[in-house]
Amino acid sequence: GATPVISVHGMGGSGLYLNPGTEDEQQVGVFDAKSLLSRGGLIQNVLAAVGGKQTDPNTVIDQIADLMNDYRNIACDEDGNSIYNVGIANYWTDSLKNHPGYLSGTSNEPAICRQVAQNIGADKVYAFNYDWRLDACETAAKLADFVDQVKAKTGKKQVTLIGSSAGTVILSAYIDQYGDRGDIRRLVMIDGALTGVSVTKLFCQDLLFDADVVKKYLDRVTTSYHNPDFDFS
């Protein structure tokens, strides 16, 4: 029979929930257009910059900081642990045959799994869901346990791993820590973050917007927008 396939998604591939598994469970960290549109001042300043008008970068920085507060629930502490009781709600150890709703999704990973399922059967396709904010090496250890479960259920000694975007970081950590187990039949990396990622400080809210850098960025936006070689129609 076919080798079982495990999909490892990228950032945002699993929804994050405050108080997961409780009556108070609610999804957090989801980009909401209303959140941006409610900041009329920020939009106005960016559009003004595009139009070639002078914009105070410090004002823009304050407006960005205010926008980021809408996503403070997904913040981590300096040790990389979630500050709030936030985690994933869906951790499936069974195949996607039992999760048709996922296979009908329109984002990247469900579409990949759907195509694979059409070729080998959904009963041989699995989705490894994880909290994409947390340590890649610790997540790789969880993936190793997941791989063991899939091998035990299918009777196969090897699996095919498909990583998308930041999921390739998890696969890199898996290869580094568990590559000598010899349980990878095939490895597929899609849009791989092969040089690593540097987002830890973002989740710890340890970041700095320099006024000069913001001003230069806005200037570049203006230059690009008015460049005849770019077609924005």
Specify the residue positions occupied by each region the protein language model found:
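N-terminal non-catalytic accessory region
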Residues: 1-162, 166-224
